[in-house]
């Protein structure tokens, strides 16, 4: 079942959503609503080419990476040891999301439009969204961004302008989280790229227990 949201700051029980995870339509992208959504594993998907409605998803099987389980291939270890790139955190959030937005606009069904970018920038300004940047000398060549609540990271998008830069960003994020008590990276959707790095499915109820830990 798909629910229509109004101005009330609430969401229906995620267990009542459609088989593909679609739970609700409408509402807004305010920081308060976004924080409430992510605290239950609900995330927005905005197919702005085809409609102006915000779609809210909450799949019952969650594709995640546990920081301690991230897989670093031999080729990635070699790349990291060469020192060609360096990685920073939260130095260029706006640039990372701009690159991700440009990439998504080229894709069919692009979702990262102006309203979404503004929403995540507001979350970053209030300390609820973060970025990882990959640099080659002084040139930004890759990165990712997502929402941070508690000890969990909800990945939203990544980009690479050179091979493996987004993988490098994700590896550094996982290592940082593992060293600092991070619990889980929510990947939202399965991809071969993420599965090769240690991603796996867990049931929503198990996922919810993790993301709501203090």
Segments predicted by a language model, with ranges:
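N-acyltransferase acceptor-side catalytic subdomain
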Residues: 1-214
């Amino acid at each position: 079942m798909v629910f229509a949201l109004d101005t009330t700051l609430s969401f229906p029980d995620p267990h009542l959503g459609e088989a593909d995870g679609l739970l609700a339509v409408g509402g807004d992208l305010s920081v308060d609503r976004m924080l409430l959504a992510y605290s239950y594993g609900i995330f927005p998907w905005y197919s702005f080419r085809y409609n102006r409605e915000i779609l809210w998803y909450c799949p019952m099987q969650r594709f995640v990476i546990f920081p301690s389980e991230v897989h670093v291939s031999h080729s990635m270890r070699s790349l990291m040891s060469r020192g060609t790139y360096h990685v920073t955190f939260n130095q260029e959030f706006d640039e990372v999301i701009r690159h991700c937005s440009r990439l998504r606009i080229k894709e069919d069904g692009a979702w990262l439009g102006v309203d979404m970018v503004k929403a995540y920038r507001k979350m970053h300004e209030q300390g609820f969204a973060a970025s990882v940047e990959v640099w080659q000398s002084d040139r930004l060549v890759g990165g990712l961004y997502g929402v941070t609540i508690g000890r969990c990271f909800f990945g939203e998008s990544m980009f690479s302008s050179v091979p493996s830069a987004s993988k490098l960003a994700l590896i550094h994020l996982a290592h940082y989280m593992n060293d600092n008590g991070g619990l889980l990276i929510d990947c939202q959707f399965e991809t071969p790229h993420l599965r090769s790095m240690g991603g796996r499915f867990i049931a929503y109820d198990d996922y919810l227990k993790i993301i709501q830990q203090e």
